[in-house]
């Protein structure tokens, strides 16, 4: 009996839009939810990209380190194949944002604990911050879900800023696809300035993951979705690898044409 021919390996994405890099020497915030006992330096991340045929990467600001952005900025200076998001004080000046943009920073990540109140979204300080980000050509990256996301996205609708929602919109919170966050996310996508990351699927119920991805592909389309590995899988290192993160992508977005369109959209968005 003739053995079935081996299928070709899936084409890897061109860009990983969500990963963290750090060393143990970096200062942790007082409220850090975990304290990694290992380093994941930029050199290790780049080696991971190379090993899997991925050309570009986006370093995502991690809550563990607050607004300590020094390591990411140093990585950007050395590696032009990278972009980064940072965390910033809302009082950051337009000049500082322009300098960060020139350095390869493409956006600012916003996240707060799930039970914490949002800032005054209609107040001067917040609106000034968002306006300055938009003027600098940066986006706002939202690591929010549920009611928090449901309240945040409508407040940004008239501010002219692009938004990227992390990790499927944290669908594990408040009702999943029937909750306020998912509904607001779909409405924001329809307005044309919001994208969603197909990332950190290992943090969601495995039995629901494919359905979440299918629904987002149906309503948003691949041009509004980015893939991110969430390497080095903080808190889940024992059960996740970079290869498994890619295999998850291939499983939940099975059409290579959809994956290619996702890559093309991310390359355009992150200005590669």
State where each predicted segment sits:
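Catalytic pocket-lining loop regions of alpha/beta-barrel enzymes
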Residues: 122-227
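Mid-to-C-terminal alpha-helical segments outside catalytic/metal-binding sites
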Residues: 1-13, 38-56, 215, 221-226, ...
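Alpha-helical scaffold segments that flank or form the walls of functional sites
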Residues: 32-60, 65-78
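Active-site gating/metal-coordination segments in enzymes
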Residues: 66-147, 195, 200-203
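Active-site environment of divalent metal-dependent phosphoester hydrolases
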Residues: 22-25, 64-67, 91-92, 115-116, ...
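Short, acidic/polar
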Residues: 39-48, 91-100, 180-181, 212
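Hydrophobic faces of well-ordered beta-strands that scaffold small-molecule active sites
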Residues: 15-19, 57-60, 83-86, 108-110, ...
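Conserved, mostly hydrophobic/aromatic
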Residues: 18, 49, 72, 100, ...
């Amino acid at each position: 009996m003739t053995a079935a021919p081996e299928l070709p390996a899936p084409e890897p994405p061109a860009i990983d839009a969500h990963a963290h890099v750090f060393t143990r020497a970096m200062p942790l915030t007082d409220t850090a939810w975990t304290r990694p006992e290992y380093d994941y330096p930029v050199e290790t991340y780049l080696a991971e990209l190379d090993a899997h045929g991925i050309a570009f990467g986006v370093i995502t600001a991690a809550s563990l380190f607050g607004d300590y952005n020094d390591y990411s900025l140093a990585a950007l200076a050395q590696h032009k194949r990278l972009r980064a998001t940072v965390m910033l004080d809302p009082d950051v000046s337009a000049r500082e944002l322009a300098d960060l943009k020139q350095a390869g920073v493409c956006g600012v990540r916003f996240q707060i604990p799930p039970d914490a109140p949002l800032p005054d979204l209609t107040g001067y300080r917040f609106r000034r911050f968002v306006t300055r980000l938009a003027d600098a050509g940066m986006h706002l990256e939202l690591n929010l879900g549920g009611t928090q996301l449901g309240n945040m996205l409508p407040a940004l609708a008239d501010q002219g800023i692009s938004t990227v929602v992390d990790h499927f919109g944290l669908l594990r919170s408040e009702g999943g696809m029937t909750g306020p966050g998912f509904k607001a996310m779909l409405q924001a996508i329809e307005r044309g300035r919001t994208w969603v990351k197909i990332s950190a699927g290992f943090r969601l119920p495995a039995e629901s993951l494919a359905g979440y991805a299918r629904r987002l592909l149906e309503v948003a389309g691949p041009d509004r979705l980015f893939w991110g590995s969430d390497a080095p899988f903080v808190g889940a290192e024992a059960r996740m690898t970079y290869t498994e993160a890619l295999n998850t992508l291939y499983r939940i977005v099975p059409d290579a044409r959809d994956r290619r369109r996702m890559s093309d959209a991310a390359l355009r968005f992150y200005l590669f």
